[in-house]
Regions:
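Active-site bordering "gate/hinge" segments
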Residues: 2-252, 376
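Short acidic-glycine loop/turn motifs at beta-strand connectors
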Residues: 215-216, 225, 275-277, 368-371
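Short, solvent-exposed amphipathic alpha-helical segments in soluble enzyme
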Residues: 62-67, 227-228, 271-274, 297-300, ...
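A structural signal for short secondary-structure junctions
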Residues: 249, 264-267, 274-275, 299-303, ...
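Oxyanion-binding "anion nests"
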Residues: 238-283
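Intrinsically disordered terminal and processing segments
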Residues: 334-380
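Dual-mode signal for accessory low-complexity, basic/Gly-rich regions
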Residues: 282-347, 366
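Short, glycine-/Ser/Thr-/acidic-enriched flexible segments
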Residues: 53, 117-119, 157, 226-228, ...
Length: 380
């Protein structure tokens, strides 16, 4: 296979999983999640969170988990439930959580989150301070989740298709391809991508300084002795990135993010940051600046970078407005404001983790200790 084939993880031999045949079949998707992503074993408890719009996938997940002699625990949210919570919640409901919520996570062996929104702008009218308070309060739940086998994925809905400017059928086919479920052997496909990314990590692991250059961007940061993670579909499905946590006080320069972001259903675009000794000292956005400023004020860690990631999935070629896909686009780099992933060696703690994307496909460059890693969206 060519380097591009490896980057897309495309296989050339058949396998044993049920194929989607170009259409997104819930049974094939569920088998991939229960088998490859979570590696569910007999006797384990799998906590699955989603909305009722993911019913076809949830029913097949129940089957796939039971077939592995494990216990499925489905937590299904109703349309409007999250907005209704923020509208009616009193202070204690924003600043605390029930003990059972943490107990479930601690007792689960694996945790699967499935995005399936009915309205991507459901929270657009909610005071961002209420959202931030709730996020801060639930930090122990997030930290407990990170210690488990966990995976985040997506089930296509009409709202997500509209956000991506696609028809429902087009978006479902797009998702199927991004998951490699249109391939004869999806697991082998993800293995091919993992191998490509492992070679990329081999080039990055000994690097001390990364430099990101593009129009409006010239940023340096240190990744010395930090651990690079090969995101091969086990934590995110789809995936296609390698990432690490930069040294918290090392980022210097400016960066312009060129892909629209939609956190909590709020459009944010044209974000520009100035960083000095790791901290954001100036920030602006052409759209959604009020949200940007509130996000940076979430807590002490929100003004520092928790992640740098390099997208490698050339099967995802266009932004969709959904970060699960967009941060994986081959030829892009993303930086996260806020929380680090502990496995990278990153030490930044925050209730915020907001990925922002810089597209390098039209004149950008990423170097490691002066060596070109990626230029104009191509790996070298």
């Amino acid at each position: 296979m060519t380097a591009s084939d490896h980057a897309r993880g495309r296989p050339d031999a058949p396998g044993e999983l049920r194929r989607a045949g170009g259409q997104l079949e819930p049974a094939a998707f569920a088998d991939l999640l229960a088998g490859y992503c979570l590696d569910v074993e007999a006797g384990q408890t799998v906590l699955v969170r989603s909305t009722s719009l993911a019913e076809p996938l949830l029913l097949e997940l129940q089957r796939a988990i039971l077939e592995r002699d494990a216990w499925p625990l489905l937590r299904v949210e109703l349309p409007g439930q999250t907005r209704g919570y923020y509208d009616a919640a009193r202070d204690r409901h924003l600043d605390d959580f029930p003990d059972l919520a943490l107990h479930e996570v601690r007792r689960a062996d694996a945790i699967l989150g499935i995005q399936a929104p009915g309205d991507v702008r459901e929270l657009a009218g909610v005071d961002p301070d209420r959202i931030a308070r709730h996020a801060r309060a639930r930090r122990p739940i997030r930290e407990a989740t990170m210690k488990k086998r966990w995976c985040s994925t997506l089930w296509p809905t009409a709202a997500l298709a509209e956000q991506a400017s696609m028809s429902a059928e087009e978006f479902a086919a797009f998702v199927c391809s991004a998951l490699f479920l249109d391939q004869p052997d999806p697991v082998r496909a993800w293995g091919g991508l993992a191998a490509f990314q492992e070679r990329l990590i081999g080039r990055l692991s000994d690097a001390s300084e990364l430099r990101l250059e593009a129009e409006g961007t010239d940023l340096t940061l240190s990744v010395a002795k930090r651990t690079w993670v090969n995101s091969d579909g086990r934590r995110n499905m789809p995936s296609g990135e390698v990432f690490t946590g930069p040294h918290e006080r090392s980022a210097n320069g400016r960066v312009r993010f060129t892909v629209r972001s939609s956190p909590a259903g709020i459009d944010v675009d044209g974000v520009e940051l100035q960083l000095r000794d790791g901290e954001v000292v100036a920030a602006s956005a052409t759209v959604g600046e009020a949200y940007l400023q509130r996000a940076l004020a979430t807590d002490d860690g929100a003004r520092f970078l928790g992640e740098i990631g390099i997208g490698t999935n050339f099967g995802i070629a266009r932004p969709t407005g959904t970060i699960l896909f967009d941060e994986k686009i081959g030829g892009t780099v993303h930086l996260a404001l806020g929380r680090s992933y502990p496995e990278t060696g990153g030490k930044n703690r925050s209730a915020l983790h907001w990925d922002l994307i810089c597209d390098l496909r039209a004149g950008g460059r990423l170097t490691a200790d002066g060596e070109v890693i990626q230029e104009n969206g191509r790996f070298f």
